[in-house]
Amino acid sequence: MNKKKNAPVRKIIADNRKARFNYEILDNLEAGLVLQGAEVKSLRSNHANIAESYASFENGELWLVNSYIPEYTQANRFNHEPRRLRKLLISKREMARFFNATSREGMTLVPLKLYFNERGRAKLEIALARGKKLHDKRETEKKRDWGREKARLLKRYG
């Protein structure tokens, strides 16, 4: 008999839930990260914060700015700077496409998830996004509340 293949295991380290509320997500992309050894060990112990971070282009390269990976406690002298710039690895075609998109006004690159893929590599899901206005945020909240209320009513009255 054929065995069913399970979905790939992705161990999520950090999730930027605030980004989906503050930004309108237009396009997603998976990028690799250039990390030091102590950073990987710190990530494996689920310590990271990408809530206030963003991606920017400098000298034709894509960098993750203001992400926080704390120092690994057992790595005494080989530790890293917790808020250092981290290079993101994407193809040249994707880099050109995202560079052209972010050069338009109001567009930015925000990280959504930081995770280990099925091969054990640290990956970052980044999104091309446009900032929401206050009325857009209120509309999103109303839709979410109505969805919850609708589910409650369906559960109650079948």
Swiss-Prot record:
GO BP annotations listed: trans-translation
One GO MF annotation is: RNA binding
Q: Per its UniProt record, what PROSITE patterns does this chain match?
A: SSRP
Give the GO cellular component terms, alphabetically. Answer: cytosol
Query: Which residue positions does the secretion signal occupy?
Result: none
- Where does this one sit in the cell? Cytoplasm
Q: Which Pfam families match?
A: SmpB
Record bears the keyword Cell division: no
Q: What is its main location?
A: cytoplasm
Q: What does the UniProt keyword field contain?
A: Cytoplasm, RNA-binding
Say if the entry is tagged with keyword Transmembrane.
no
The job of this chain, per UniProt, is described as:
Required for rescue of stalled ribosomes mediated by trans-translation. Binds to transfer-messenger RNA (tmRNA), required for stable association of tmRNA with ribosomes. tmRNA and SmpB together mimic tRNA shape, replacing the anticodon stem-loop with SmpB. tmRNA is encoded by the ssrA gene; the 2 termini fold to resemble tRNA(Ala) and it encodes a 'tag peptide', a short internal open reading frame. During trans-translation Ala-aminoacylated tmRNA acts like a tRNA, entering the A-site of stalled ribosomes, displacing the stalled mRNA.
UniProt cross-references to PANTHER family, sorted A to Z: SSRA-BINDING PROTEIN (PTHR30308:SF2), TMRNA-BINDING COMPONENT OF TRANS-TRANSLATION TAGGING COMPLEX (PTHR30308)
- Can you tell me which family this protein belongs to? Belongs to the SmpB family.
Write down what this protein is called.
Answer: SsrA-binding protein
> What is the scientific name of the source organism?
Bartonella henselae (strain ATCC 49882 / DSM 28221 / CCUG 30454 / Houston 1)
What gene makes this protein? smpB
